[in-house]
A protein has these predicted regions:
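A short, active-site helix/loop in glycosyltransferases that binds the activated sugar's phosphate group
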Residues: 139-164, 169-174
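Conserved acidic donor-binding segment of nucleotide-sugar-dependent glycosyltransferases
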Residues: 298, 313-321, 327-334
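N-terminal strand-loop element at the rim of the active site
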Residues: 6-72
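Aromatic "clamp/platform" in nucleotide-sugar-dependent glycosyltransferases that forms part
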Residues: 259, 278
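A short helix/loop element that forms part of the nucleotide-sugar donor recognition site in Leloir-type
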Residues: 175-191
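A conserved mid-protein helix/loop that constitutes part of the nucleotide-sugar donor-binding site
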Residues: 15-23, 196, 200-219, 236-242
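Short His-centered aromatic/hydrophobic patch
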Residues: 94-101
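A charged, aromatic-enriched C-terminal amphipathic alpha-helix characteristic of glycosyltransferases
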Residues: 334-363
Length: 366
């Protein structure tokens, strides 16, 4: 009997979600076959480590079943029901609400198959979503969220229990891949002699707040022209952010290298990691920076406080002036001391053990 991990797609925009599912599935009982279905395309390497990965290459119209495509829903449900039976599925790990809308209808006639839906971020629940999720018993369907903050929010909306699966990276595995500072800077093309290097990692989308960060960073260059900001990631806002860099005269002071495949190994290139997000379900960047020993400036979101507590250095969400002041003030702080406090607060080793135990419980259906 196997576990089927169902995700929407592969590719760099989904990298953090793939990491979380990989970490969860790594805690499955030894010998349990794990198969991954990507509803659309691409197969990330981290999921291949767990077992067979299949890209189903289904169209969005077929999957979403809107308009005239609603007529195809019975066939879609039949397709997935047969596929689950063929693969002797015992459990289905479902990536968020979008995939749940596709998969759960097929499980109505398969009461022996358990489903675990993992919520990675805030989502707009429609009335039909609530009805769908309430059709299943607690024995067949488990709802999980990657942080306590997110679990509380979704549970309040659904009026259903949501298990907190506080996602945590394996600190030992992550630390082994980290490059030394000089080597990491060389790979990123950082000029020698740069006074301070600030790093930000994430998709180039509105919720990440990089537009606010650019405006704030520009203000700090008046007194510290030898600073550098690198924003690693790709997304729909690239053209807008590039135009902002040009308008603010930040050419050469801000680098937008796009998606970098080995970004997890490069954190020690930074003096500080900046996380100006407007909203986050978890924020794996927090964990990656802490394990790398790099101090963090982050938006004052509850999900970041959940991880860093009083050791966090927080800045008001979307407040350009506050971000400029915080970046300016960072020069007077001991990065070693700040990083040590944040590491002690997150306590990656014990957080990883708690996460492993929680995953084992969820996957076993206890």
């Amino acid at each position: 009997m196997s576990i089927i991990n169902v995700m929407w797609s592969g590719g760099s925009p989904y990298a953090s979600v793939h990491k979380v599912h990989q970490q969860i599935l790594s805690q499955a009982s030894p010998g349990t076959p794990v198969k991954t279905w990507l509803l659309q395309h691409s197969a990330p390497a981290c999921l291949r480590e767990l077992g067979q990965v299949e890209a189903l290459k289904l169209s969005s119209r077929f999957l979403k079943g809107r308009g005239i495509w609603a007529l195809s829903r019975p066939w879609r449900n039949c397709f997935f029901r047969k596929a689950l039976l063929k693969n002797d599925a015992r459990q289905v790990l479902i990536d968020g609400l979008g995939v749940a809308r596709v998969l759960l209808p097929a499980l109505r006639t398969l009461p022996h198959v358990r489903a675990v839906v993992i919520f990675h971020g805030s989502t707009r629940l429609q009335c039909k979503d609530v009805r769908l999720l309430r059709q299943f018993s607690g024995e067949q369907l488990t709802l999980c969220a990657v942080s306590q903050t997110l679990a509380d929010s979704i549970s309040a909306d659904l009026k259903l229990p949501v298990v907190t699966l506080s996602s945590m990276l394996n600190p030992h595995t992550f630390e082994q891949q980290l490059l030394p500072r000089d080597q990491a800077r060389q790979q990123l093309g950082i000029p020698a002699g740069t006074h301070q290097v600030f790093g930000a990692v994430g998709r180039l989308v509105d919720s990440k707040g990089f537009d606010t960060l650019l405006s704030a960073f520009a203000k700090t260059l008046v007194n510290h022209p030898d600073r550098l900001l690198i924003i690693i990631g790709e997304g729909a806002m690239r053209a807008e952010l590039e135009a902002q860099v040009k308008a603010l005269g930040l050419q050469g002071k801000v680098l937008l290298p796009g998606y970098v495949d080995n970004v997890a190994s490069l954190y020690r290139a930074f003096d500080w990691v900046l996380i100006p997000s407007r909203a986050e379900g978890l924020g794996l960047v927090v964990q990656e920076a802490v394990i790398a020993g790099v101090p963090i400036l982050a938006s004052d979101l509850p999900v970041f406080y959940e991880q860093l507590g009083e050791a966090g250095n927080y800045v008001a969400v979307g407040d350009e002036s506050a971000w400029a002041r915080a970046i300016e003030a960072s020069d007077a702080l001991s990065t070693t001391e700040v990083a040590a406090r944040q590491h002690a607060s997150l306590d990656p080793e014990h957080a990883w053990l708690r996460f492993r135990q929680a995953c084992t419980t969820v996957l076993s259906g206890l």
